[in-house]
Structure formats: structure tokens, C-alpha cells
């Protein structure tokens, strides 16, 4: 019996405010769906953040519907929890999964009041949706009930969407030891880097599936090391970390941390960009360059990248001035995302304050009522 674990598609996210990056994220999701159909697992579990926003754009909804309908046509059910990006900040607004459920019916199973489902009378699947730090005590109560309800099952999976220590030691909401110790697979979302860890003396596997595309430049190094995509698990026999394998998708190339201090560095970087032109998608470039080479380099690579962020290096001052194609708003949004803050709320408040919006306090009040 096989299952797929996926998370953090963030459909609708427009990195650098580019159509091409929004489409990349749709394509990565649909590539995952196509690979899942090739594998034909018994079911799919999804650990949240299907969408970038709780009010996703039409194209994001269309993409999600296209992919999930393909699974339905192959009789592959999907078990899905809400991540922080999927949950509306105002209680008056509906959740996007409602529309999906109306069309997909029982092939899409979510975890609201009902914290568990059972697949084929054999596999117990529990789910706890994302909550803010102040609501974690309620999550512990939910975990106790899930653990109690699962006692008569040998095969058990638990979905969650939180930051967990030691994977995020600087800013976490829960500990690995907070989770029931007799579940086979603890399936996480929220963290965009892949992670697999045997726990409970190797009898359980704790996992983050990671995102299905590069959502931030901070993810590039991990992508090159561990890839992006989903996990495939096998519950047929004795279950341990060897029962899990990575299934990868290909993302657009990012060239980062390039230092151009002389003509040789210049030539190598241009050649690397030229060699990537045979790929279907133009790369994204982050680099530092000395002042005297900046103008010629900027002109030469003008048509070789989708997006570039170049820092001029003043070797005397050992400082850099960033010259890029971003607006202040784009840089601000990326900074918020890198800090793992709530991009939708912080950026929404920022815009309201700029416009002297009288509803700013109501906006903040609705957010905190819904999250704390």
C-alpha cells in the first residue's frame, strides 16, 4: 500500500511579481500530479498551503481543480489540511477548500471538526490544521483525541502544519516529542526544505515534504542538495525511514552568490548564463560585481535572465549597492516571507497604513480574533 506526501504548493504566488514565476509554480504542481498518476498510489496526503492566499486568484483555483480532478478520475483520494496561507484572516470570509469540496466530493477529505479519517478500513489518518502560538494548547487536546481514536489501527499517519523543534530551533511552536509516539508517519508542512528523521527508536518517521517550487532565494541551496517535489511512502510491510523515497520535479535555475571581481569571473558567469539558454526557462541571477564591470555586464546579460538582482561592489568601502529590477513592495514582500512572517497580513496592513485606511484597526482586530 503506497501513499504520496505533498505540501506547500503556494498556488498563486507571484515571485518578483512576474507572470512567469506564478506559472512556474502552477507547472511544478501539475508535474507532481502527473508523476503521482504514473505511480498510482492508493492515496495522497497534503500538509497544507495548497494556496498562497485564502482568496486565491482564478488561475490558482483553476490549477488546483485541474490537478485534483485528475486524481479523482484515477480514484486516488486526497487528504488535505489547511496551512496558514489557506486560512482567511477575517472570520467573515470563507475558506477556499469549500469550493474544491463541492466539485471533488468525497475524493477530497479535509480536517475541520472531524480530526481523522480512515482509508480502506485500514489506515488511520489524523490531521491538525495550522494554528498560531496562542492556540497550541487546543492542538494538544486534538492530538490526545486523535491518539485515542487511533488505538485500534496498526497503520497510522498524522498530518500537521507548524514549525517544530529541532527543525526550526530559532522560532518553533511545537516539539517533536509533542506528537503521539506510535504513529508510523508524521507528515509535516510549513517548512519549505525537505526533512526526514527517524524517531521513537526508528519505529516512526517524522517528515517535512518541503515546497514543490522555490518560493524564496533562501531555498536555492537546499533545492540543489535535496530537490523539490514529494515523498512516496510504502505501508505494505514493516515501516521505517527506508520505506520513504523522494520524487523530484525540476525547477527554474537560480544562480546565486556569484562574485564578479575580475574579467575572468565576468567571462565565467556570462558563459554559464549562455549555457543555460538551452533550457526551457531563462535563469534567475543574484550576483555581486565590481563597479568598473557593472555597465558592460548588465548590458551583456540583458536577455539572458528572467530576473536579475545585481549588487555593485565598492572594493574600497567594502560595501554594496543593490541594483535590481524589483520594486520596493516586491523586496518588502520577499523579506517578510524569508522571515517566515504572515506575508498577507503584514503586507496588507502596510498598504492600508500607507493609504490612511480607516479600517486598519478593524483589519488588525479581525486578524487577531481569527488567530489568537
Curated annotation (Swiss-Prot):
Pfam families for the chain: Metallophos
Active site annotation, chain numbering: 85
SUPFAM superfamilies documented for this protein: Metallo-dependent phosphatases (SSF56300)
Any one of the GO BP annotations: double-strand break repair
EC number: 3.1.-.-
UniProt xrefs under Gene3D superfamilies: 3.60.21.10, Mre11, C-terminal domain-like
Activity modulation: Nuclease activity is regulated by Rad50.
Keywords from the UniProt entry: DNA damage, DNA repair, Endonuclease, Exonuclease, Hydrolase, Manganese, Metal-binding, Nuclease
GO molecular function: 3'-5' exonuclease activity; DNA end binding; endonuclease activity; manganese ion binding; Y-form DNA binding
Annotated residues for binding of Mn(2+) 2: 49, 84, 161, 190
InterPro entries cross-referenced by the UniProt entry: Calcineurin-like_PHP_ApaH (IPR004843), DNA_Repair-Maintenance_Comp (IPR050535), Metallo-depent_PP-like (IPR029052), Mre11_archaea-type (IPR032885), Mre11_N (IPR041796)
Keyword check for Metal-binding: yes
Keyword Hydrolase: yes
Function: Part of the Rad50/Mre11 complex, which is involved in the early steps of DNA double-strand break (DSB) repair. The complex may facilitate opening of the processed DNA ends to aid in the recruitment of HerA and NurA. Mre11 binds to DSB ends and has both double-stranded 3'-5' exonuclease activity and single-stranded endonuclease activity.
Oligomeric and partner information: Homodimer. Forms a heterotetramer composed of two Mre11 subunits and two Rad50 subunits.
HAMAP family assigned: Mre11
Record family assignment: Belongs to the MRE11/RAD32 family.
Name of the protein this chain belongs to: DNA double-strand break repair protein Mre11
Provenance organism: Methanococcus maripaludis (strain DSM 14266 / JCM 13030 / NBRC 101832 / S2 / LL)
